[in-house]
Design a protein with these regions (language model features):
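Bacterial N-terminal signal peptides that target proteins for export
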Residues: 1-13
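An extracytoplasmic/periplasmic, membrane-proximal ligand-sensing/linker region
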Residues: 187, 191, 208-229, 234-240, ...
Length: 333
């Protein structure tokens, strides 16, 4: 079971989602579903409006419908708390597709982290999308130069039900900051951005694709956005205690950067229910995911590559449809 500290950190919504997941784990829920369980009416879980998942989910929903010939196919992008919520709702049949961080998906299938004691057995990997960097966002006028400077500050750490929340706590902990050392705002960057602008938040820790349009919007409004680096022994601690990889945000990512910013990253990936999405439809979804990526309007489309489609799969089973597509592409042994 989750510790009381973890439960408080997750909030009621995420805890309720995990309780529902527990009901979906165990014998009979893994593997593929029967034909009567498959559907072409798909709900795609995304994230908050301030991140990349939401617009990407909207655009992919349109691409799926426009490029896949399947009777009755309808795909609707749904705003959610992101990774944890998306995987939990796939487990209980409320979503059929979802975008999530690869490290959160590993936890889901292994019953670890946010999913302690609640293994998800009906989620299949459709493929890696793009890297997501941890971005510790503040304003130049804040005087914040290091994560350690966030002691006593008001920090947005992401909404309950998202992988950002757990990542933010890991980052803060590596710098010696635990619950009570800062005031936590449980919201996504869409809301946190406004609070940074009006002075009701000192910083926001986000896991976002680079470049993040919402961060560029904040710079356009304030003219003083600053990214706080993760480096030194603290960076080593974060990497050693998580599935994050060292990453460097290039200086040309944002106009306000003068030099690269060291940080960590995970991978955003698309997942599908193995109970409700058939092999045939899963194949078409995976094919569209990569062969229509150039049709996206988001900058992250440049990072979506079929050659790297299986990166970050880890312990998550391939969806049968994705396996078929990847075999055709020569990606599997």
């Amino acid at each position: 079971m989750l510790t009381s500290k973890r439960r408080r950190g997750m909030g009621l919504m995420a805890a309720a989602a995990l309780t529902a997941v527990a009901g979906c784990s165990g014998g009979g829920s893994g593997g593929g579903g029967g034909e009567d369980d498959f559907t072409t009416n798909l709900q795609l879980g995304t994230g908050s409006t301030g991140g990349v998942y939401f617009p990407m989910g909207q655009e992919y929903s349109t691409l799926f419908v426009d490029n896949i010939e399947a009777e009755g196919l309808n795909v609707t992008a749904v705003e959610t708390g992101a990774s944890v919520e998306n995987l939990a709702k796939i487990a209980r049949g409320e979503l059929q597709l979802g975008i999530a961080q690869h490290n959160t998906a590993q936890d889901a299938v292994n019953g670890e982290g946010e999913f302690n004691g609640a293994t998800v057995e009906n989620v299949g990997f459709l493929g890696k999308l793009y890297p997501e960097a941890a971005q510790v966002i503040t304003l130049e006028s804040s005087g914040i130069d290091s994560v350690s400077d966030l002691r006593g500050k008001t920090v947005a750490i992401g909404p309950p039900g998202g992988g950002t929340r757990d990542a933010a706590e890991q980052i803060l902990s590596a710098y010696g900051l635990e619950e009570g050392d800062y005031t936590a705002l449980e919201e996504g960057f869409g809301d946190a951005k406004a609070k940074l602008q009006d002075g009701n938040a000192d910083a926001s820790i986000e896991i976002l694709g680079v470049p993040a349009a919402s961060l560029q919007e904040l710079q356009a409004t304030t003219g003083e956005v600053k990214l706080v680096p993760l480096d030194g022994t603290e960076l080593d601690t974060i990497v050693g205690q998580s599935q994050f990889e060292p990453y460097e945000i290039p200086a040309d990512t944002y106009d306000f950067l003068d030099e690269p910013v060291p940080t960590v990253s995970v991978f955003a990936a698309m997942y599908a229910s193995t109970n409700q999405v058939s092999e045939e439809l899963g194949y078409e979804l995976t094919k569209t995911l990569y062969e229509q990526a150039d049709s996206l309007t988001l900058a992250q489309k440049e990072l979506i590559s079929v050659e790297e489609a299986t990166v970050g799969q880890g312990d998550v089973p391939l969806h049968p449809g994705a396996r078929k597509y990847f075999q055709e592409q020569g990606l599997l042994d």
